[in-house]
From Swiss-Prot:
InterPro entries: Ribosomal_bL28/bL31-like_sf, Ribosomal_bL31, Ribosomal_bL31_A, Ribosomal_bL31_sf. Keywords: Ribonucleoprotein, Ribosomal protein, RNA-binding, rRNA-binding. HAMAP family: Ribosomal_bL31_1 (MF_00501). The keyword Ribonucleoprotein applies. This is Large ribosomal subunit protein bL31. It comes from Prochlorococcus marinus (strain MIT 9303). Residues 68-93 are annotated as: Disordered. GO terms for molecular function: rRNA binding; structural constituent of ribosome. Part of the 50S ribosomal subunit. GO terms for cellular component: ribonucleoprotein complex; ribosome. NCBIfam families: L31, PRK00528.1. The gene is rpmE. GO terms for biological process: translation. Belongs to the bacterial ribosomal protein bL31 family. Type A subfamily.
Length: 93
């Protein structure tokens, strides 16, 4: 005999929310689904280019490979100088 009450609740009209707007409804085990990208704003379907920056990874890449602005290069030099000072103080101990 199967166990009773082990299945999750089913919401046949679950709302899919993207950027604060309800974009579609679907069936799900959660009443609301929050998404960053859906077919209505995905670059493949819209034909536009959009950079999806997750946790500053694009900025870090730009700084690392010198594709950023002059301010980013100056910030990188400051960070390198701080790291060198930390290395020098740890070697003296």
């Amino acid at each position: 005999m199967p166990k009773p009450d082990i299945h999750p609740n089913w919401y046949p009209d679950a709302k899919v929310i993207c950027n604060g707007e309800v974009v579609m409804t679907t069936g799900s085990t959660q009443p609301e689904l929050h998404v960053d990208v859906w077919s209505g704003n995905h670059p493949f379907f819209t034909g536009t280019q959009k950079i999806l920056d997750t946790e500053g990874r694009v900025d870090r890449f730009m700084r690392k490979y010198g594709m950023g602005s002059a301010d980013a290069a100056a910030d990188e030099k400051k960070t390198d100088a701080k790291n060198n000072n930390k290395d020098n103080t740890s070697k003296e101990d």
